[in-house]
Design a protein with these regions (language model features):
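Conserved catalytic or regulatory cores that recognize and/or transform ribose-phosphate-containing ligands
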Residues: 1-160
Length: 160
């Protein structure tokens, strides 16, 4: 019997080298997971509509429409919460939070990933995830997590 392979939308900021490195680590782990279709991991940074001038209205419209369409086509959203971790800031990126909310509203499971272990978690995020992988060691478990069963995995983070 073959195992279903899930399509993933990867929600994450990708504006700095540190952010892009975290994305690559998470993608690498997901590609090792037997319940993930490694060819169906949608990474928004790879779909930026270069045919339109960056920041223009047409570019904004195309990127927003594409990202929202892909969130709703995904079986699961994996969200990297770290935004400005290198600067010691622990608030998630607003775009990532929007994508989490969109997925949750559409009943698409959200798997949260956070490299910064000591941060606190906003109540709205704390109630919207299916599983939470906290810290570099725990994040390694993404490669073995069963995205078909989607077992609830809680975090001990303080909730605000």
């Amino acid at each position: 019997m073959s195992t279903y392979k899930n399509k993933v939308y990867l929600a994450s900021p990708f504006f700095s080298d540190g952010q892009r490195e975290r994305i690559e680590q998470v993608i690498s782990l997901l590609k090792q997971n037997d319940t993930i279709d490694s060819d169906q991991i949608f990474n928004p940074q790879e779909h930026q509509f270069e045919s339109e001038p960056f920041g223009s209205f047409k570019w904004q419209d195309a990127v927003f429409a594409s990202d929202m369409r892909q969130v709703h086509k995904a079986d699961v959203v994996v969200a990297i919460l770290d935004y400005q971790l290198e600067d010691g800031l622990t608030e998630p990126d607003s775009g990532t939070v929007f994508e989490i909310g969109s997925a949750h509203e559409a009943n698409i499971p959200v798997i949260m990933v956070q490299f910064g272990e000591k941060s606190q978690l906003n109540l709205m995020l704390a109630r919207s995830y299916t599983a939470f992988f906290n810290g570099r060691e725990d994040i390694q478990n993404l490669k073995n997590y069963n995205f078909n069963n989607l077992e609830q995995k809680y975090t001990e983070k303080k909730v605000l």
